């Protein structure tokens, strides 16, 4: 069953409590029945390494007016690999247009542009990503009720208040987070 989730948000449901994905919001960069899915967690900010640390490791010299973007734990796969999810107003070599509004770039060009104060209007960097085999995500959504699907908004994807993104995504689909529970009890 093709759900067409590219460019949407996966919002962790209570079924994922006490797992790696608890209270995560994932922007789906790619999803197809044949290839599975790939996405980036956009609400788990990393304190280390910070953007300056990454610039130093990569030999990129920032020059004023350097842009500040958040660095998130993108997911449990390929932690050493960096991805920049950004507005579609910038594209470089290897950039992938996700949905006409958002672009994914995994090359150093974008970091050099950001360090120089240029590049896309909005961006978030992720180290690592989340991935699902063909059919796996559909099963987690339809059978396991592990994820809610929400529209991606710039405020949630690129916003800097990472602690509020999960709640914002639930509110966007008319769920009251206070009413959610990971278990059902008896009266």
Curated annotation (Swiss-Prot):
<comment type="similarity">
    <text>Belongs to the UPF0301 (AlgH) family.</text>
</comment>
<dbReference type="Pfam" id="PF02622">
    <property type="entry name" value="DUF179"/>
</dbReference>
<protein>
    <recommendedName>
        <fullName>UPF0301 protein GOX1459</fullName>
    </recommendedName>
</protein>
<dbReference type="GO" id="GO:0005829">
    <property type="term" value="C:cytosol"/>
</dbReference>
<dbReference type="InterPro" id="IPR003774">
    <property type="entry name" value="AlgH-like"/>
</dbReference>
